[in-house]
Amino acid sequence: MLDPSSSEEESDEIVEEESGKEVLGSAPSGARLSPSRTSEGSAGSAGLGGGGAGAGAGVGAGGGGGSGASSGGGAGGLQPSSRAGGGRPSSPSPSVVSEKEKEELERLQKEEEERKKRLQLYVFVMRCIAYPFNAKQPTDMARRQQKISKQQLQTVKDRFQAFLNGETQIMADEAFMNAVQSYYEVFLKSDRVARMVQSGGCSANDSREVFKKHIEKRVRSLPEIDGLSKETVLSSWMAKFDAIYRGEEDPRKQQARMTASAASELILSKEQLYEMFQNILGIKKFEHQLLYNACQLDNPDEQAAQIRRELDGRLQMADQIARERKFPKFVSKEMENMYIEELKSSVNLLMANLESMPVSKGGEFKLQKLKRSHNASIIDMGEESENQLSKSDVVLSFSLEVVIMEVQGLKSLAPNRIVYCTMEVEGGEKLQTDQAEASKPTWGTQGDFSTTHALPAVKVKLFTESTGVLALEDKELGRVILHPTPNSPKQSEWHKMTVSKNCPDQDLKIKLAVRMDKPQNMKHSGYLWAIGKNVWKRWKKRFFVLVQVSQYTFAMCSYREKKAEPQELLQLDGYTVDYTDPQPGLEGGRAFFNAVKEGDTVIFASDDEQDRILWVQAMYRATGQSHKPVPPTQVQKLNAKGGNVPQLDAPISQFYADRAQKHGMDEFISSNPCNFDHASLFEMVQRLTLDHRLNDSYSCLGWFSPGQVFVLDEYCARNGVRGCHRHLCYLRDLLERAENGAMIDPTLLHYSFAFCASHVHGNRPDGIGTVTVEEKERFEEIKERLRVLLENQITHFRYCFPFGRPEGALKATLSLLERVLMKDIVTPVPQEEVKTVIRKCLEQAALVNYSRLSEYAKIEENQKDAENVGRLITPAKKLEDTIRLAELVIEVLQQNEEHHAEPHVDKGEAFAWWSDLMVEHAETFLSLFAVDMDAALEVQPPDTWDSFPLFQLLNDFLRTDYNLCNGKFHKHLQDLFAPLVVRYVDLMESSIAQSIHRGFERESWEPVKSLTSNLPNVNLPNVNLPKVPNLPVNIPLGIPQMPTFSAPSWMAAIYDADNGSGTSEDLFWKLDALQTFIRDLHWPEEEFGKHLEQRLKLMASDMIESCVKRTRIAFEVKLQKTSRSTDFRVPQSICTMFNVMVDAKAQSTKLCSMEMGQEHQYHSKIDELIEETVKEMITLLVAKFVTILEGVLAKLSRYDEGTLFSSFLSFTVKAASKYVDVPKPGMDVADAYVTFVRHSQDVLRDKVNEEMYIERLFDQWYNSSMNVICTWLTDRMDLQLHIYQLKTLIRMVKKTYRDFRLQGVLDSTLNSKTYETIRNRLTVEEATASVSEGGGLQGISMKDSDEEDEEDD
C-alpha cells in the first residue's frame, strides 16, 4: 500500500507541487537566485553560498514553516500562503472549530514540508553511499561498549544480591564476600550509577573496571600465602565477578551477540548504510526502492556523471557569486576574493578525487583510500589546449570468444573422412578444433582471443584431411568471415559458408557463436549516421564507440574494420547533447540527435528510437551537462496502450523514472543539488544521526559509528559544507544533549572546539581561510555555553564522572576547559587563571557534595528510626549521627582520592596543580562538616568521653592522607580534642592513684588465679568493646564516670599467666589500657604526642613505684606476723608479693620506657627500685629462715657440755635405757627443720614466677644457713658435741645440702669453705663419738651422708 501523500492526484495539483519545490529551495535551472538571507548563505556550503530561491528561509535553520518561501524574492513558484488561503472559504466570524482546523492544516503543511525535506535529503545521502569518492569508513576508531539499561542494571543487582544471600553455586571465601558486599553497597546501589545508566554512559566494562580497582587494594593488603600469588587471587576474583555478573546466561550466546554487535560497529555494507539512514530520516521501504531505481544508484556511470554535473554546477555558482558580488558577510572584506578561490579549489580537489577513481563497471563497494591526483590538465578544465586527445590515447582492448558447434551440408565426403575447423582473428594467432568424422561434424570448441580492433574480422575455415600421398596441405572446404561488435547477439547462429572451388557441396552451413565483451572504458557502441563541421564532414554511416579515457575525459570515436586506432574522434568536453528533429537533406537514419558546442555542431542519427535514447543517455553522462535531454515522443509512448514491448522496455531507467514521477518523487531526483542550502540540510541530517546514535545499544558518548562518519564526511565533501559549520552544529547538538543529562565524551567536544577555534583564528585546519561573521558569532556563543557546561561538570564531578567513569573523562574535561579559557589558539592561558576558575568550581563542588551527603545521611537516619518517629534528639543521638556522617565523609574523600585525583599522574606536569586544588576542595568539604561536628560536640555533657571514637575515626583517616595530615581541619580537630585528652588523662591519673591507695589498704594478697571465681569482688575493669577505660566505681563523686574501655587481651593475661594481686593486676592493666588508648589516638602533632607519651610514662613510673613500695612494706609486715619456729610455712601472700615485683619489672619495660635515648631514665629508675626492693625482700625472707634455724640451734645448745641440763639429760637417758627402749634423741628437731626447709623450697619454687629471684633466694638462704651453723660450731671449738647435737646437726646439714642441691644450687656454692669446715668438724666429732660411745651414732654419719649423695648422683 502506498502512502497517501504520494498519490497520483498530486501530479494534477501544479500549484501545490511548485510551492513544495520552492520550500525545498529548488529553482528552475535557468534562474539561480542569490540567497534571501546573507547570514543563512554564509552558513552554507563551501562555495555554494546558500541555496536558490527561498532556500535560506525554507530549508535554513531559521525558516518559519511554509511561509518562509515568500522571503526568497525573485522568480518562480507560488507562495504556500496563497495555497492555504484558497483552499476553503473564510468565515466572517471565525469560530473555535475553524481556528482548530487552521492549526491542523498548518500542522499538516509543516509535516508535509518536513517529509519532503527528508526525502530530498535522503536522495543526497543515497548518492553519497552509492558512489563515494572522497571518504572511507574509518577502521581506527575506538570500539564502543554495549551500554547497560535500567533493566539490565536491576538484573545485575539481583544477581549480586543472590550471590550475597548464598543462592548461587559460586564458591567464595570471606574476603571475596566482603569485597562483593562493599561493591554492591557502594557502587551498584549508588544513585550516581543509576544516573550514569540513565545518561547512556554506563557499560558492562565500566562495572568490571570499577570492581577491579575496588579489589586491587584489598588483594594487595591480604597476607602472603605460600604458592599463591596476589595476581592469581586477583584473576580468580575477577573470574568469579564475571560469573556473578553473567548469571545463568550461556556465555556462548553472549559471545555471539557481542561478535555481531562488534561487526555492526565496524564496516557496514551499502545495504546496511541505506537501511540505517532510512531509519534516521524516517524513509519508508517503498520510497527507498523508488528513489534507488530512479536515481540509477546501481549504475556507476550514471553516478559519476551526476557528480560531474554537480561539480560543474558548483563552478558556475561560484562564477555567479563572483559576478553578482553576493558574498556571505566575512570578518574581513579581503576574504571575498579568497572565498571564490576556495570554492573553485575545493571543486577542483573533488574533480581530482573523481579523476583518481578507476574507470570500471563498479559493482563491488570498495573502501580504499583514494589517491588524490593533481593532474593540471584535469583540474584546469578551461585550458582545452592542454586537454586534447590524440588517436593513440584512445586504446580499447576487446576479448572475443568463438565457439564452433557443428557443420551441415557435408554430403560428398565419405562418412569416415576427418574434418576440422580453424579460427582466427585478423592479425592474431590461429586455433584449431578437434578432429571429427564427416558423418558427425560436431565440436563445441571455444577459442579465446584478444584484439584492439573495434571492428575485428573473425575467420572460420572448414578443412578435411588430404588422402593423397603427395598432398602437403589439407583441403579447405569452405570459410566464413564475421565482423562482430559488442552489441552482436551472444547466442550461437547458423552462417552460410563460402565454398571452395573444387568442393562439390555448395550448401555448407556452420553453427557458431561469437561473443565480444565490452571493455570497461567503452560506454556505448553501434552504427550511426553522422556529419560535423570539423570531423565526419560527410553524411555517412560509421561504427561509433563512446570511450571514457578518464573520469572527466570522453571521446566519440569512429572506427573502420580491422583498425586499432579510431578513424576520427570528437572529444566531448564542453558539448551538450539533445534530441533533434530530422534534418532536411540528409538521407539515411530515422532518429536524430546532436552534440552542440559554441562554434560546432555534430548531427547523429540512428536507425531506431530505442538506440537513439541509449546513445543520448550515454553521451549525457559523458558531457556532464546540467540540462537533461527529454525524448520528444516520451508522453505519447507512455500513454499508448498497445505500443511494442521493445519500445516500452528499452530504457529501463526511464521506466523507473516514470514510476517515481507517478509517486511524486521526480522532484527530488531531478532537483539540482547546487540550488540547496546544504549547510542547513547537513545540520539536520547530523542532528538526526546523533539522535539515532545516542538511542542505539552502544555507550557511544556522542561518537558516531564508522559508517555514520563515512556518510557525513562524504556529504560534506561532495556538497561543500564548510568544516567550521559542521563542527559548530555538532558542538551545539552535543551541548544540548550534555545539558539535558546525556554523557558526552569531553575529548569529542575538544576535537570539534579545537577545529572551530583554529578556523576562527585563521589557522586553516581544513585549508579554508575565510571566516564568516556568523561563524565567529556562533563560535563565541558556543564557547561561552561550553565554558558554563564544563564548569558545571567540574562542580558536579562526583555525579558527572561517577567512580572515575568514563575513563579519563575528568582529565579531558580539565584539558578542554583550559583550551576554552584561552583567548586565542597561540597564547596559553596563565595557570593561575585556570586554577582560579577550577578552585571556584571545587569550592562550589564541596558545598554540593556535602549538601547531598547530609541529605543522604538524614534519609538513612529516617529509614533506620522509622519506628521511633517521636524520639527526641539527645546529645548521644546527635553524636551517633555525627559519627555516621563522618564515616560517609571519609568514604567520599576516599572515593575522590581513588577515582578523581589522578589527572596529574597521567598528564605529567600539565595538571600538577590539580592535586593541590583537590586538597583545597577536601579542606572546604571538611570545613562544612566541621560546623555540624562542632555543633554536635558543643551539646555533649562535660567530662564524657563518647566522642573519642569520632576523633579516632577522623584522625586515623587524616593522618594517613599525605595531603590532609595536619591540614586546616586536622588542626581544628586536634585543638578540639586536645583539652579533652588532657582532662581525661588527669582524671585517669587521679583514679588510678586512688585505686592503688584503697586497693593496697584492703589487699588480701591472694593471687588473682585463685580468685577467678570471685571476679566481681575484685577491682578489675569492665569487659566491653574496646573504647575507653573505666574509672573504678570507688572514686569520689566529684570525678566523672569514665565510659567503658578494654584491651582485647587482658582477660587472657589474668587467667593464664601471672599470680599477682588484684590491685597490682588492676593497676598494670589500667596503665596499659590508658597508654594503648592514647597510643591508638595516634596524635598527629609530634610535640603534643611526645608530651602525652612522656606524661603517661612518668605516671606509670610513679604508679609502679608506689605499688613496689607498698608491696615492700606489706611484705615486711607480713613476715613480722609469721611464726619463728619450724612450724613456719611460706604463705601464698609472700609469693604473690614476689610475683608483683616480677610483674612490675615486666610491665615497667613496656609502660615506663621511652624511645628517645635520654628519656630511658623512667625505666632505669623504676628498674633500680624494683631490684633494690627484691634484694630487701630476699634478705628479709632469708633473715626469717635464719631466725628459725637459730631457734633450732638454740634448742641444741642446751646439750652443751658442762650445763646442768646436759648432765641431767645424759643421766636420765642412761638410767632409763636399762628398763625401756628410749627413742633416738634430737631426731624430731632435725626432722621438723628439714620439713620446714623442704616445704618452703617447694612453695617458693611453685608460686614465684621468676627463676632468677628463686636462685638468688636459695643461694643466699643456703649460705646464711651454713654460716649460722658454722658460727655455732665455732663457738664450741673447745667442747665436744653432745651425741644428740651431733646426730641432729649431721642430719640437718646432710639434708640441707642435698635439698639445695636438688633445687639447683650450684656445687661451687654448696661446697663452700664454710660447708667444708662444718663437714670436717662433724666428721671429727663423729669419730670421737664412735670411740667414746660403744653403740656409735646409730647409723647417722657424715660418711653415710656422702654415700647417699653419691647414690643420688
From Swiss-Prot:
Segments of this protein annotated with the region Mediates targeting and association with DCVs: 1177-1353
Tissue: Specifically expressed in neural and endocrine secretory tissues. Expressed in brain and pancreas and at low level in heart. Also expressed in fetal heart, cerebellum, cerebral cortex, medulla, occipital pole, frontal and temporal lobes, and putamen, as well as weak expression in spinal cord.
Physiological role: Calcium-binding protein involved in exocytosis of vesicles filled with neurotransmitters and neuropeptides. Probably acts upstream of fusion in the biogenesis or maintenance of mature secretory vesicles. Regulates catecholamine loading of DCVs. May specifically mediate the Ca(2+)-dependent exocytosis of large dense-core vesicles (DCVs) and other dense-core vesicles by acting as a PtdIns(4,5)P2-binding protein that acts at prefusion step following ATP-dependent priming and participates in DCVs-membrane fusion.
Modified residues (Phosphoserine): 34, 91, 98, 261
Lineage: Eukaryota, Metazoa, Chordata, Craniata, Vertebrata
Gene Ontology, cellular component aspect: cytosol; glutamatergic synapse; neuronal dense core vesicle membrane; presynapse
Localization in the cell: Synapse; Cytoplasmic vesicle, Secretory vesicle, Neuronal dense core vesicle membrane
Keyword Transport annotated: yes
GO molecular function: lipid binding; metal ion binding; protein kinase binding
Gene3D superfamilies membership: Pleckstrin-homology domain (PH domain)/Phosphotyrosine-binding domain (PTB)
Keyword Protein transport: yes
Comment field on protein domains: The PH domain is essential for regulated exocytosis and binds phospholipids and plasma membrane. It however does not mediate binding to DCVs.
Chain intervals with Acidic residues compositional bias: 1-19
Skewed-composition ranges (Basic and acidic residues): 98-109
Stretches the record annotates as Interaction with DRD2: 790-1129
Principal location: other
Organism annotation: Homo sapiens (Human)
Protein name: Calcium-dependent secretion activator 1
Annotated spans, Disordered: 1-109, 1329-1353
One family name in Pfam for this protein: MUN
Biological processes annotated in GO: dense core granule exocytosis; exocytosis; positive regulation of exocytosis; protein transport; synaptic vesicle exocytosis
GN (gene name): CADPS
